[in-house]
Structures are given as C-alpha cells and as structure tokens.
Amino acid sequence: MVGQGLHNTGFPTIRYGLALNLLSIGRLKFESYEVENIRPLVTASPLFSRLLTELGEQKLARVIGATEMITGSLIAARPFAPRASALGSLGAAGIFATTLSFLATTPEAWQEKRREPKLSLAGQFLVKDIVLLGASLLTAAESLQASRRTQSTTR
C-alpha cells in the first residue's frame, strides 16, 4: 500500500516536474542573458555550431526554447492525450541526450589541472540531465502503456 501510494504521488511529480522544467527553461531561451549562457555549449557542439552559423544566436536560442516548451506541453497532456505525451517524453529524452553530449564537446565542462577528470560548475549543470533523461524514458513508457489501454477500451 505504501509503495503504491508513493508511486501514485511520485509518477505525477516526475511527469509534471519534467514538463515544468522544460516549459520554464524553454521560456528563458527568449531572454538575452540566457542566449549568452548557452553560447559556450552551442559553440563547442558540432551539431549546434552549424545551426548557430545558419541561424544566429538569437534565432537558435528561440528554436531551442520553442522546442522545449512544445515538448513540455506535450508531456503535460497525458490525462487527455497519452500518445502525444509519449511523443513529448521521447522528444525530451532526445533533448537531454543532446545536452549530455555537451559533456564531451564543451571544454568548460571539466576542471583542468586535476589528476583525474572532475566536473566544473558547467559540467555539474549538465550531468543532472541524466536524471531528466531517465524521467523522460519513464514517462514515455507509462504514456505508451496508457495509450494502449485507451485503445483497447475503445475497440
């Protein structure tokens, strides 16, 4: 019983916390200071540096922000659109896998002059996306299961 109660509380917390995270951070991409904050990450990334050249900093930040906000909205749509929520969760998994790749491409993610690699403040900021990636995969799985249940009851 306690386990089920924790599950019933924990899963919505994961889902809506994930959605809120994406909506909030996505909205910030429309602020000039956030454009400056993501500059070192996108400049060092092979994928994003190309997009940066084509779109410029402001447009790239807005595309990223809009993507994050749409993804967060889809995740939150789970009660009435579980398939859309699953799509949003899978999109979020892609977002967080991409940001985790910045650990490999951003020199500022690691402290220099150490015997073994140690995360810098930027690296610590990025490594939390492992948890968000896991949350995205869990919410995708649950939404897909809910979608199947919905389909089987409507047949």
Segments and roles (model prediction):
Residues 1-155:
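Membrane-interface extramembranous regions
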